[in-house]
């Protein structure tokens, strides 16, 4: 059974109460439960991790290479400025799919650039929670191609 790590970055623990007009009413717990169910149906073991701390996210990315076949990552606001997370992604050999609930290109101008996307296998934005499922499908396809 393939193993995948789902990493959610800062403030995503506030889903369901934070800017519901942008992120919707669904909670992180709901998202994680739905993703685990989807993964199980695909024969994939999914582990979920959320942190508001850059170093903790970097540590999980580093550790993932020896445990998982791939990562689905929503770096949150770190997307736009964390060269440290970018370098952590670049340092591992497993594919990473970047996902965002909202379309970062339709939001404030400071959100338009992703410093992490260039070292990811792909990026999915703007499809709400469904984007995470798309990321899982894309990651499984990427692994089949390898």
UniProtKB/Swiss-Prot annotation:
It is an enzyme of class 4 (lyase). The record marks 18 as: Transition state stabilizer. Keywords: Amino-acid biosynthesis, Aromatic amino acid biosynthesis, Lyase. InterPro entries: DHquinase_II, DHquinase_II_CS, DHquinase_II_sf. It comes from the Bacteria. One of its GO terms (biological process) is aromatic amino acid family biosynthetic process. One of its GO terms (molecular function) is 3-dehydroquinate dehydratase activity. Transmembrane segments: none annotated. Catalyzes a trans-dehydration via an enolate intermediate. Belongs to the type-II 3-dehydroquinase family. NCBIfam families: aroQ (TIGR01088), PRK05395.1-2 (NF003805), PRK05395.1-3 (NF003806), PRK05395.1-4 (NF003807). Homododecamer. This is 3-dehydroquinate dehydratase. It comes from Bacillus anthracis. The gene is aroQ.
